Amino acid sequence: MNPNQKLFASSGIAIVLGIINLLIGISNMSLNISLYSKGESHKNNNLTCTNINQNDTTMVNTYINNATIIDKSTKIENPGYLLLNKSLCNVEGWVVIAKDNAIRFGESEQIIVTREPYVSCDPLSCKMYALHQGTTIRNKHSNSTTHDRTAFRGLISTPLGSPPTVSNSEFICVGWSSTSCHDGVNRMTICVQGDNENATATVYYNKRLTTTIKTWAKNILRTQESECVCHNSTCVVVMTDGPANNQAFTKVIYFHKGMIIKEESLKGSAKHIEECSCYGHNQRVTCVCRDNWQGANRPIIEIDMNKLEHTSRYICTGVLTDTSRPKDKTIGECFNPITGSPGAPGIKGFGFLNEDNTWLGRTISPRLRSGFEMLKIPNAGTDPESKIKERQEIVSNDNWSGYSGSFIDYWNDNSECYNPCFYVELIRGRPEEAKYVEWTSNSLIALCGSPISVGSGSFPDGAQIKYFS
């Protein structure tokens, strides 16, 4: 075949292919037009439109059927604000729900040095919160961690029952004093940082900085070292500024979404307030605090969360629960501190004032931070002559204890009442064990109430401190 024949043959093939493509295109166009026309004729028969409003999390499904429009709205409820509508459960004994054994693990693991731990819950779980020292136990920076206030401290949270490590701890905020609570929707946290005479409290809501509070007495602004409490979107916090051994200046501060909505200076007969352990019930908040100036009996603050008002006084019983403390008294005081030697300085503690089911916690030793016991004292909050009815040992007196405080899982739907819970800090190292180590840290145990009587047992820290030498 000569070149001209090849050219004509190729052109013929190209023309045939082009015609075939054209016919295919025409048939496709006809099919699309037909389908579109059928779709248009039935378009209004059954159309579903879904609108999601992210703010209110409301889904609206609109069904169009011929000429009738039917709206069906389904509200997807966010967890609502916590309402303190229940009373405290009756308790017949206490059971351990968590023990992290942090110091025992710390002999070989990289456990973070902490103090001032506490427990706080949200709708999903309960966690431990603690103020770290910016180091681990086996790190040389752990030397001299007896100091309460340094620039290296900050609040962390860890799963309850797990010792705090770098990998399992979540950073919350910088500071050397703290409180934190959940309002049912988001968590509010306060940390105090800076110089003793010029400190600042930072307030966070949903992990975002919302406001700050500057010292008002220029003498170690400080707060609870345990959880605050919220009701109907308002969270209440007790803060103190001023001397630890003289008249100080305490405020009860109310927050909404991390913003201050009201402040009250301390009212009532309490002479000195520090490190309150608070719990909610019956639309009220009760705080059991520390009088570091005079009283071996604990002051209490009672807060009406509807009126946003408070008053203060002392636990009435003559059974004293601060450390150091003199011997128990036959008759207590409701409106004045009970003094005596040994007295100051005091320790953070707690109690659950529930009429004839009242329980108070204290160290077993009246002088040292050792041992821990729970005492059932009916009507201790109101009766100066109330006496110990039951006693449960938590930590034997030959083991170190420390701070203690209250917490409640307000979102436990298995109960029609709030089950009281508490934790005990188990301090190890300096100052009591200074001949072995240069650091101060702690482990933690947490306990909750049982509706029936329980057995016995002691739950100390359990670490052999000489292994760290």
Curated annotation (Swiss-Prot):
Task: List all topological domains (Virion surface).
Answer: 28-469
Annotated GO biological process: carbohydrate metabolic process; viral budding from plasma membrane
**How does the UniProt record describe the way this protein sits in the membrane?**
Single-pass type II membrane protein
* EC annotation from Swiss-Prot or TrEMBL: 3.2.1.18
Modifications made to the protein after synthesis: N-glycosylated.
Q: Which SUPFAM superfamilies match?
A: Sialidases (SSF50939)
The transmembrane residues are: 7-27
Q: Where is the active site?
A: 148 (proton donor/acceptor), 403 (nucleophile)
According to the record, the residues making up region (Involved in apical transport and lipid raft association) are 11-33
Write the record's keywords in alphabetical order, separated by commas: Calcium, Disulfide bond, Glycoprotein, Glycosidase, Host cell membrane, Host membrane, Hydrolase, Membrane, Metal-binding, Signal-anchor, Transmembrane, Transmembrane helix, Virion
Binding locations of Ca(2+): 291, 295, 322
- Glycosylated residues, per the record, are 28, 32, 46, 55, 66, 85, 143, 198, 232, 399
**Which InterPro entries does this chain map to?**
Glyco_hydro_34, Sialidase_sf
Q: Which cysteines are joined by disulfide bonds?
A: 89-417, 121-126, 181-228, 230-235, 276-289, 278-287, 316-334, 421-448
Q: How is its activity regulated?
A: Inhibited by the neuraminidase inhibitors zanamivir (Relenza) and oseltamivir (Tamiflu). These drugs interfere with the release of progeny virus from infected cells and are effective against all influenza strains. Resistance to neuraminidase inhibitors is quite rare.
Return the annotated region ranges for Head of neuraminidase: 88-469
Location comes to: Virion membrane; Host apical cell membrane
Those parts of the protein on the Intravirion side are 1-6
Write out the domain note.
Intact N-terminus is essential for virion morphogenesis. Possesses two apical sorting signals, one in the ectodomain, which is likely to be a glycan, and the other in the transmembrane domain. The transmembrane domain also plays a role in lipid raft association.
- Quote the subunit structure annotation: Homotetramer.
Function as written in the Swiss-Prot or TrEMBL entry:
Catalyzes the removal of terminal sialic acid residues from viral and cellular glycoconjugates. Cleaves off the terminal sialic acids on the glycosylated HA during virus budding to facilitate virus release. Additionally helps virus spread through the circulation by further removing sialic acids from the cell surface. These cleavages prevent self-aggregation and ensure the efficient spread of the progeny virus from cell to cell. Otherwise, infection would be limited to one round of replication.
- Protein name in UniProt: Neuraminidase
Source organism of this protein record: Influenza A virus (strain A/Equine/Cor/16/1974 H7N7)
